[in-house]
Regions:
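Phosphate/dinucleotide-binding and metal-coordinating scaffold of catalytic cores
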Residues: 1-176
Length: 177
């Protein structure tokens, strides 16, 4: 996608309190774009003034959400609860604050995972169970003695290239999440 913002109604203001340079996210997003990540949030530094009072420099960013102009995956419906329909279009986030969300779970290795899409109102019990099972199967494959096996190891459960891109960008940016 080009470097202009997505046409959407939802945006995120990031305070970057822990980044006094105000450069970490813009640099990470640029590295992400250059690494060929399928979605990288657009962002701009903005000065926020509320009721005439200066509040600081923030980053106005695309919100990470399922949308053709953002994370372009199949939008799940409650009817998508069987067969191939059950397997597609989920947006999850590994997040230490997952326990504060409605749709979340802790993986078999204690990793907190928030289900971002489908929304709390739309996700079904079967869809939640599918996501949790898929995540736990990935963990089992990663931690197994045969983790390098092409058919039973982690490669059969994830897109290794996109995971490595995400990991490297996070490391270069000093992302602690």
């Amino acid at each position: 996608r080009d470097e202009s913002p997505a046409k959407a109604k939802k945006w995120t203001l990031i305070s970057n309190y822990g980044d006094k340079t105000l450069m970490r996210n813009p640099v990470a997003y640029e590295v992400s774009r250059r690494a060929g990540m399928p979605f990288t949030p657009w962002c701009r530094c903005v000065d926020v003034i509320l009721n005439g009072e200066y509040k600081g420099c923030y980053q106005l960013c695309d919100q990470i959400t399922v949308d053709k102009n953002r994370v372009n995956i199949t939008e799940m419906e409650p009817e998508d609860s069987e067969g191939d329909a059950l397997t597609g279009g989920y947006l999850v986030e590994v997040d230490a604050y997952a326990g504060q969300e409605t749709s979340w779970f802790s993986s078999s290795h204690g990793i907190p995972v928030t289900i971002k899409s489908p929304s709390d109102d739309d996700i079904t019990t079967r869809q939640k169970a599918y996501i949790k099972r898929a995540f736990n199967l990935l963990e089992r494959a990663l931690w197994s003695s045969s983790f390098q096996n092409d058919s039973t190891g982690y490669r059969s459960k994830m897109d290794v290239e996109s995971f490595l891109r995400h990991f490297i960008v996070g490391e270069l940016a000093g992302n602690t999440d």
